[in-house]
């Protein structure tokens, strides 16, 4: 994002133009993490470009106050205003915005770095879009994950336990015999989002219990992997999608057979990363359960199994 694009995006939020975070909050009562990070990036860009003027200052200040006000109203029992899809850890987003605005006013980009709020892993999870993941280039226990996007969409749209389990079982081969495969951390991102959706709507208790049972199981696998000698994980979650870590675009059956038959076909670093990033994703679940004041026993056990995660 260059300075001109950043200023334009700030102006769009100031004007509550369609597609901006403030438009979504005010007109659609919806919080979009992607739109939040777009606004955050725009402020960060003008800070690093040392671009300041009275008009921009007014726009940033107005956007900041409007966002805070709408988030506060979300908890006003006397107000009919309600924000859908508000993340359980919304104060963290407010903190991020606080530091961005403070950095602008003080003309000091180091504030953002020293604050340690720009967490790359959490941000990556926030903005992950299942439609942009190369599922067909990830191997599973029985082939590839080419149909995972459609199956995850089906899981999002059903509250019937029998149909849900049927679809879930079709994508459950990201784990087999206590082994996680490349799609695992990515699938878990969307399963955690489905959990939040179900808790927010207050329905499908049977599905919630099914998810929590599986989350506990996967967290246990991650702990087992962590307790053994292992390589360092890949530096970034997104590195899992680097070309060298995926199947060739024109892969053939022999490519899959080599992976299944040759224990050295996958590096120790890549293999451990499946567990490392899966555990990071699962570490968010206890706070989600606590936010919705439900399933305290599962929350306690999941927290025990996912503690000491740098998220």
State what each model feature region is.
Residues 42, 123-228, 232:
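Alpha-helical solenoid scaffolds in large eukaryotic transport, assembly, and signaling factors
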């Amino acid at each position: 994002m260059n300075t001109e694009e950043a200023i334009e995006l700030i102006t769009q939020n100031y004007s509550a133009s369609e597609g901006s975070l403030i438009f979504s909050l005010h007109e659609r009562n919806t919080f979009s993490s992607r739109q939040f990070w777009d606004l955050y990036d725009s402020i960060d860009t003008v800070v690093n470009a040392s671009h300041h003027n009275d008009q921009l200052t007014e726009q940033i200040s107005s956007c900041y106050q409007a966002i805070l006000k709408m988030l506060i109203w979300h908890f006003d029992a006397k107000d009919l205003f309600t924000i859908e899809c508000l993340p359980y850890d919304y104060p963290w987003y407010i903190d991020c915005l606080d530091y961005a605005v403070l950095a602008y006013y003080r003309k000091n980009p180091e504030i953002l770095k020293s604050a340690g709020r720009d967490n790359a892993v959490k941000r990556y999870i926030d903005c992950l879009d299942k439609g942009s993941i190369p599922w067909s280039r990830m191997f599973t226990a029985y082939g590839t994950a080419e149909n995972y996007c459609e199956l995850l969409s089906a899981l999002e749209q059903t509250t019937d336990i029998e149909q849900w389990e049927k679809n879930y079982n079709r994508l459950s081969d990201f784990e087999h015999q206590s082994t996680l495969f490349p799609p695992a951390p990515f699938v878990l991102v969307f399963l955690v989002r489905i959990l939040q959706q179900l808790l927010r709507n207050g329905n499908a208790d049977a599905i919630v219990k099914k998810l929590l049972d599986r989350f506990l199981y996967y967290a246990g696998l991650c702990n087992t992997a962590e307790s053994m000698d292992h390589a360092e994980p890949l530096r970034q979650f997104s590195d899992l999608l680097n070309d060298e870590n995926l199947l060739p675009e024109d892969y053939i059956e022999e490519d899959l057979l080599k992976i299944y038959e040759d224990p050295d076909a996958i590096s120790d670093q890549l293999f451990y990363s499946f567990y490392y990033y899966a555990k990071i994703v699962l570490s968010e679940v206890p706070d989600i359960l606590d936010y919705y004041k439900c399933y305290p026993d599962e929350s306690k056990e999941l927290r025990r199994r996912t503690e000491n995660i740098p998220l």
